């Protein structure tokens, strides 16, 4: 067996080739991070092997720098292993007491790990889907947060330009209101609008729910409004609504891609009532391979949902707060998914009510339900069985 260790960096990659007997077949050599470098790597590997030899390629998970070099050995049909940099660091320290860390040393370390660590798992199609899901769900998370900030700006601007509007509509953040404010960004513009045009804008945007009487009500409120006439704020409001609409379209496109991958993954956890595609995809993406975790408690710790402990002498903390370490995306997905599951699933609803009856605050009770949900998800992913309501 031939082990190829690759230390990844932005502009070049250091490579080292080792046999399973520990013989150095190719000392550390460097290839540029381009097509010529990739093309030169494969003949070098083939030159060190015999037809019957198995080849293993290993590299560290270094974020976006490793994506392209990772795809090359996979496209060549070579089993490829992606290793956690922390794992590599600890392994290197176990080999020597010297504080030596260079790209050349890391390449040797990765090759040695491939030779000695039989528990490493190769990169598979499932790993690819997890990476795609992680990119998409995190991208969506950031877009949704960006949109939320813009919606706060809309609320702030309406308070300045037409504060009475909020009491006349179910929400400021609906299509009909955004259409109205895009056309008439302020009380003064609405007050001067022709009633027929105002009624048409509202009726078309609300699909007929807002009639002439609603248009009169809004115009009368605008004519008696205390809102300021500030052209700069009106322009900001129009542009902010335009940005929100663009983000809505982008988020919809992202969610479409997520749905396509989830159809391929076909995870059983989406059968849990209240656990939708979006939160389910985020949980799957952040956890990755469930077999990497010995128990559901390890996933809780990875998400930062385990209780912290502080003890010194006779002092022990009375209230254990969540550690809030690890993946904040996973923590967010689990906590929010739990809230919806507790609404739609009677078993979880009863469990949440039980914790609330014990006097626990709402968020504390939800955190207990979250632990229960993680254990359920872990069991379902390991067994592959869909969710069944307890009888």
Model feature map: region roles:
Residues 1-391:
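A detector of single, family-specific signature residues
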